Amino acid sequence: IARKIKRIIEVALKREGLELAGWRDVPINPSVCGEMALNTLPQIEQIFVNCPQEISAENFNRRLFLARRRAENKFEDLDPYAYINSLSSDSISYKGMVMPDVLAEFYPDLLDERMATSACLFHQRFSTNTLPEWRLAQPFRYLAHNGEINTIQGNRNWAIARSKYFCSDSLPDIKDIDPIVSLNGSDSSTLDNMLEVMQAAGMSIIQAMRVLIPPAWQANEMMDADIKAFYEFYSCQMEPWDGPAGIVMMNGRYAACCLDRNGLRPARYVITKDRHITIASEIGVYDYPADAVIKKGRLGPGEMLAIDLLKGELLDNQKIHDQIKDGAPYKSCLLYTSPSPRDGLLSRMPSSA
């Protein structure tokens, strides 16, 4: 079965004009696994794909996304537990059904001195509404989630219902990747599915998350009119994915954290003199000396904090709003917005940097 699945992936890559560079058996240490994890221990391999010359990183990742989704639809019937952790030029995902403090022991790669990164996203909580599975271990491809999406059934139903009207110049073959969200995964995995589709269609991860998990804007008389127009424009096309939810997310450009509008999950941050920032739900995650800290705080309901990894810039909630409101003339867009889904969702999504 493994050989068949690998062949399916290779064919999907070739369809997107991508060249396979090779496969690697990922070193693992099963001795740290519990009984259930050992009984379901998967075969773990890493794929390497050459980037074609003269295409952008964004286009490369979009092709990888399409290849992955087509492959997943093909091999699902062969093995429903087969799973592609990530297929991206920006990030790599190490996940497992093991205790958090032994993840680096399970994956010796993480102990290798040559392993280096400017940003890392991790998750140490355990599922409360789904049975543990290797493929459902967090983080997912873009996000990790603390809490629940209590509107998940409605969000899934609307995503599937609207998918026939989704269209984007960036994803001309979007019908090939139906269903666009998982119906049998966790609530967090479904949110991750929706986030990656919106990014592949041309939205930034920050803008996409503000559409999916907006603040309470309707009755906020202090909110900038242009920002309110942004949220009103997208409210006609996407219902809020309501928590309580604390979300951390990362792609090659941004690392960010946001709370849903209820604000019932903690998200605390610390910034140090040597330009390190740590955002976590628990204070005990970081142990910086007091004299090394220049700022600390917590996110409020509906707020977001992000780091532009390319520019090395911290974006607070106001800067994020300034960025997304300048992406399009949303007040004017509202004049042409209809609540009808038949107008095409992704095609009417102005994308901001």
Residue ranges, per PLM feature:
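Short, glycine-/Ser/Thr-/acidic-enriched flexible segments
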Residues: I1, M99, F126-T128, E148-N150, ...
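Conserved catalytic micro-motifs used in adenylation/nucleotidyl-transfer and phosphoryl/amide-
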Residues: C120, P132-I149, Q153, E239-T278
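Short, compositionally biased
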Residues: A159-P172, D316-L335
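Phosphate/diphosphate-binding loops
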Residues: E232-C236, G246-I247, I283-N317
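Conserved small/polar residues in nucleotide/adenosyl-binding loops
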Residues: Y336-D343
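Hydrophobic alpha-helical segments, chiefly the membrane-spanning helices
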Residues: S347-S352
